[in-house]
Amino acid sequence: IFFFVFACLLALSAVSAAPEPRWKVFKKIEKVGRNVRDGIIKAGPAIGVLGQAKALG
């Protein structure tokens, strides 16, 4: 009985440890996406100014 409980514990720990690296990949993708979004938001006013300058010129 003890061996069975130990085997179940071992299996559960292996399953819970397996998805961890995948979550790190998703976090990296999310961080890159956030940086791109922030860059677009910050570049928005500059693009608007360039558009107005072209319209005037």
From Swiss-Prot:
PROSITE patterns: CECROPIN. InterPro entries: Cecropin. The keyword Cell inner membrane does not apply. Residues 1-21 form the signal peptide. GO terms for biological process: antibacterial humoral response; defense response to Gram-positive bacterium; innate immune response. Cecropins have lytic and antibacterial activity against several Gram-positive and Gram-negative bacteria. This is Cecropin-A. It comes from Spodoptera litura (Asian cotton leafworm). The gene is CECA.
